[in-house]
Amino acid sequence: MIIETHLPNLLHRGKVRDTYGIGSNLLLMVATDRISAFDVVLPNGIPHKGLVLSQMSAFWFRLTSGLIDNHFIGLADDQRVIEEYNSSNLLAQLPLEIARRSMIVRRAQRIDIESIVRGYLAGSAWAEYRRNGTVWGQRMPKSLKEGQVLSEPVFTPTTKAEQGHDQNMTHQQVVDMVGEDLARQLEEKSLAIYSFAHEYA
């Protein structure tokens, strides 16, 4: 089980991933076996969680690349990626247990918003609905059941907190943070990716 990694050029240690610099324009993102639940990193991990997380991420980044450009280049154990992007020789030296759970990505400017789409009445959406009859402030029909499919998916952005709880964001808060145009793109692209993945699954 890998809870924490210790490689050269650590840039960031998040709730689940450790991120390292590779040259001037690439990053190595290592998915650990740390567990983050309800925005809290728990003391125990889950064996192979990071491996599964990276494999799933790679699958969806490849599949949705026609909908939106992304930063994904490849998995760190992919021989093609090693040959093309191994200028620092780091990739060839990675232990297999680290390489298999790691992605090589382009450096990009991160938007500190979690673009969440909800198609089912569950989790915090269910809790809000029980309290107020709303999901992200939008009035919902009466008598919905937990886990029920929503008539239309709802864009429910949150802050992307480094530590602690992510906070719900209103549309206006998103606009204030990134501007009207990018706020619209975030919502439209998030809903498009959700619909595509929902149809695929």
Q: Model regions: which residues?
A:
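Polar/charged alpha-helical tracts
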Residues: 79-87, 172-185
